[in-house]
């Protein structure tokens, strides 16, 4: 099996075990009021279903896509009482809405899954990446802290480590925002995940579509590799990270081996491509803007220390930003409002010194002024 497994899949038997005994995950959710941002996304919707199984006091689903919110709303309605959850159509960049939701529902815990994630798309939409991923998280964390919420957990990404894409840099800024705003009253944490198998827009659905149409299957580079987990595994890791009592900071899972994308393509071809009775070729197209050959979960300044549960590691060695961080975030906000890409990139590099912007992004201001 190609998937790099971090632990046993969280299948129905595992969920039965979770529900049958006292455990930190159940304790953290049962009877509690939970706010989930990005609730209609691939990870968010799976997380919503998992949370509902653990019987929260109330679950607030915040999602900016009407279609996605309606889908998760209907899915939960098929198995859960309507008064168990509330669906809120809105954007995490809407601070007035966030304040209203926090004041009205008084959540005990926030799971922050809302994010823009597609690397090449964000390279051509840099203001959206920074506004949503960086500033959206920063403002959410400030409001959560001011409201006295006990904890906030953000789903982060391995692309935040030594980022070369603006998506990765924006998520690293989001991580630093949580480290900066962490307090004894409100625990701020993040968990870095790799690629989730089968998520929309990822290689697996793209490969399956290419195979269905007879190929070729396009891979960026023969040596490019990624870490993969199944959605059930990702959800279980998120719930475990949120349930670590008294812990804050950044967490990473116990890792298996990375998987070559060309091997994923070949496995899917062998599995599904033989049905049409002809060979399906693989072609290499070159790395896309912002893509790496391989991803990392730790920078050279970071060290991973095991947690008590054994499934996760806490990342240490992060330099928590000083008071200038808030000034830089104000600068980022102004840059987004004024659409000043040059200064925005400069500010991102001040916040994330190891960010290496792509040539495409650096050339964008010159193209715009030409």
What is each residue range found by the language model?
Residues 87, 129, 152, 188-191, ...:
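Hydrophobic/aromatic anchor residues within beta-strands of the central parallel beta-sheet
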Residues 1-111, 297, 303:
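N-terminal Rossmann/SDR dinucleotide-binding element
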Residues 106, 112, 116-172, 180-181:
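Conserved Rossmann-fold NAD(P)-dependent oxidoreductase catalytic core, especially the SDR/UDP-sugar
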């Amino acid at each position: 099996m190609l998937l790099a497994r971090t632990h046993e899949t969280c299948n129905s038997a595992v969920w039965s075990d979770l529900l049958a005994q006292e455990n930190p995950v159940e304790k953290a959710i049962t009877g509690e009021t939970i706010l989930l941002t990005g609730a209609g996304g691939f990870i968010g919707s799976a997380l919503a279903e998992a949370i509902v199984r653990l019987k929260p006091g109330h679950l607030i689903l915040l999602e900016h896509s009407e279609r996605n919110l309606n889908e998760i709303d209907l899915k939960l309605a098929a198995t859960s009482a309507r008064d168990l959850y509330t669906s809120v159509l809105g954007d995490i960049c809407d601070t007035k809405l966030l304040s209203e939701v926090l004041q009205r529902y008084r959540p005990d815990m926030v799971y922050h899954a809302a994010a823009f994630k597609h690397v090449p798309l964000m390279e051509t939409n840099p203001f959206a990446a920074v506004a949503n991923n960086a500033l959206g998280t920063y403002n959410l964390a400030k409001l959560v802290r001011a409201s006295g919420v006990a904890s906030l957990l953000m789903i982060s990404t391995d692309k935040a480590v030594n980022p070369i894409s603006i998506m990765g840099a924006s998520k690293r800024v989001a991580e630093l925002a949580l480290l900066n705003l962490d307090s004894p009253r409100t625990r701020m944490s993040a968990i870095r995940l790799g690629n989730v198998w089968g998520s929309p827009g990822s290689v697996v659905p793209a490969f399956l579509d290419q195979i269905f149409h007879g190929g070729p299957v396009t891979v960026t580079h023969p040596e490019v590799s990624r870490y993969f987990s199944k959605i059930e595994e990702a959800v279980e890791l998120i719930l475990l990270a949120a349930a670590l009592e008294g812990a804050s900071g950044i967490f990473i899972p116990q890792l298996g081996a990375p998987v070559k994308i060309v091997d994923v393509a070949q496995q899917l071809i062998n599995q599904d491509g033989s049905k049409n009775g002809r060979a399906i070729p693989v072609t290499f197209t070159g790395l896309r803007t912002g893509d790496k050959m391989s991803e990392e979960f730790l920078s050279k300044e970071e060290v991973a220390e095991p947690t008590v549960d054994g499934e996760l590691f806490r990342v240490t060695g992060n330099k928590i930003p000083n008071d200038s961080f808030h000034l830089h975030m104000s600068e980022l906000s102004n840059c987004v409002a004024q659409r000043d890409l040059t200064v925005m990139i400069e500010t991102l590099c001040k916040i994330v010194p190891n960010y290496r912007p792509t040539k495409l992004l650096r050339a964008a201001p010159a193209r715009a002024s030409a």
